[in-house]
């Protein structure tokens, strides 16, 4: 992998000079192979090491180079043709392949090549961008968007119309991460590299970016960019410094352990505020 890293880093330094006509064969093959590895889940843009999420920026650079160098092509679909630089992930799948991977994809869901979808996953009509990683047992409901490089954990439920923000540029930005066993309520937006930690429940219509205040009503603590594990979060507001108006905030109304989460319905947790 070190060889790939060096080739990609060197190519990215020259990205404004490189094009389809002058790129060398080794660099082109490396870029395509990195995207193949992403597509198969053998590498990922971000991974958790020693309980800390680490972003592999060189993989993001590979995606950008792939997009710079690819030409638009026509892709055939059952309902429409498409014209894009990145092919569709499942354009060559047959029934046997879907069954082997235990994935259900409902039309007209769009999943771009270079994203990874693990087994036992259901994808309703939605959009999954390149570089995204969706782990096993996850449900992506209707009109949900999983942005570029977003990381979705195991047994996650992304409800209808949810937006999970993508990030390719600026390079220093980290991807949005939804950890294992989370529930994201309908029409919520989690963006700008925010991390929703394991076992959290986000109510309908909650918007969280890096500048959003995340208020823990039990402790009075205000967080940014991270929802702690096993939190139940709803939309709310906090008074301004001069107390003349209120500003939007996400409010942690309670924390629940995994046993409670397994026993109690999500709707009940949100009602008992």
Swiss-Prot record:
<comment type="similarity">
    <text>Belongs to the transferase hexapeptide repeat family.</text>
</comment>
<protein>
    <recommendedName>
        <fullName>2,3,4,5-tetrahydropyridine-2,6-dicarboxylate N-succinyltransferase</fullName>
        <ecNumber>2.3.1.117</ecNumber>
    </recommendedName>
</protein>
<dbReference type="Pfam" id="PF14602">
    <property type="entry name" value="Hexapep_2"/>
</dbReference>
<dbReference type="Pfam" id="PF14805">
    <property type="entry name" value="THDPS_N_2"/>
</dbReference>
<dbReference type="GO" id="GO:0008666">
    <property type="term" value="F:2,3,4,5-tetrahydropyridine-2,6-dicarboxylate N-succinyltransferase activity"/>
</dbReference>
<comment type="pathway">
    <text>Amino-acid biosynthesis; L-lysine biosynthesis via DAP pathway; LL-2,6-diaminopimelate from (S)-tetrahydrodipicolinate (succinylase route): step 1/3.</text>
</comment>
<dbReference type="GO" id="GO:0009089">
    <property type="term" value="P:lysine biosynthetic process via diaminopimelate"/>
</dbReference>
<dbReference type="GO" id="GO:0016779">
    <property type="term" value="F:nucleotidyltransferase activity"/>
</dbReference>
<dbReference type="GO" id="GO:0005737">
    <property type="term" value="C:cytoplasm"/>
</dbReference>
<dbReference type="InterPro" id="IPR011004">
    <property type="entry name" value="Trimer_LpxA-like_sf"/>
</dbReference>
<keyword id="KW-0963">Cytoplasm</keyword>
<dbReference type="InterPro" id="IPR023180">
    <property type="entry name" value="THP_succinylTrfase_dom1"/>
</dbReference>
<keyword id="KW-0220">Diaminopimelate biosynthesis</keyword>
<keyword id="KW-0012">Acyltransferase</keyword>
<dbReference type="InterPro" id="IPR005664">
    <property type="entry name" value="DapD_Trfase_Hexpep_rpt_fam"/>
</dbReference>
<dbReference type="InterPro" id="IPR001451">
    <property type="entry name" value="Hexapep"/>
</dbReference>
<keyword id="KW-0028">Amino-acid biosynthesis</keyword>
<feature type="binding site">
    <location>
        <position position="141"/>
    </location>
    <ligand>
        <name>substrate</name>
    </ligand>
</feature>
<keyword id="KW-0677">Repeat</keyword>
<keyword id="KW-0457">Lysine biosynthesis</keyword>
<dbReference type="InterPro" id="IPR037133">
    <property type="entry name" value="THP_succinylTrfase_N_sf"/>
</dbReference>
<feature type="binding site">
    <location>
        <position position="104"/>
    </location>
    <ligand>
        <name>substrate</name>
    </ligand>
</feature>
<keyword id="KW-0808">Transferase</keyword>
<comment type="subunit">
    <text>Homotrimer.</text>
</comment>
<dbReference type="GO" id="GO:0019877">
    <property type="term" value="P:diaminopimelate biosynthetic process"/>
</dbReference>
